[in-house]
Amino acid sequence: NEENCIKLFNKHKKIDLLINNAGFGLFGEFSKTNLDKELNMIDLNVKAVHILTKLYLKEMIKKDSGRILNVASTASFLPGPLMSTYYSTKSYVYELTTAIFEELRRIRSNVKVSVLCPGPVNTNFNNVAGVNFAIKGLSSDYVTSYALDKMFKNKLVIIPGFTNKLAKIACKFASLRLLLKVD
């Protein structure tokens, strides 16, 4: 919640790197999924990322250094039927981070932001979300090392794995009608 984000910030103001990597998903038709769980998801996946990014970004801009890595998902490029709230939260993280990147560029700041957009990763996410992906997930070690390498090379959008990169490209050219059929 907001109070915990502010407490965390006040306790650890002086950091050089923020990685916003908390999140969970929920599988099911939007009209049937639990509203309280969805609001908790929005609090964690959107509000916490937003608050922590804003608080730490202000401090980083003051000292003109620092990095923020926000974790979105390849889900941020798709509508996401049956996981609509999760996909929407990840779209928010993606769009927020890319907008901040441009704002930092315009003020010629040395602060860097990146957004990580992995596809399925071998974690406990599937169990919590109640979903099984058709494609095999990447190892968390691979995603971590890839993300850090690209982040320190100042890459804005970081997409690990050939299949995930291909999926993002395909999304640019596919019709919305076709994307809505992806599950």
Indicate residue ranges for each PLM-predicted region.
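Residue(s) in the substrate-gating loop at a strand-loop-helix junction
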Residues: 73
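Active-site helix of classical SDR
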Residues: 53, 89
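C-terminal helical subdomain
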Residues: 115, 132-168
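Conserved NAD(P)H cofactor-binding loop of Rossmann-fold oxidoreductase domains
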Residues: 21-26
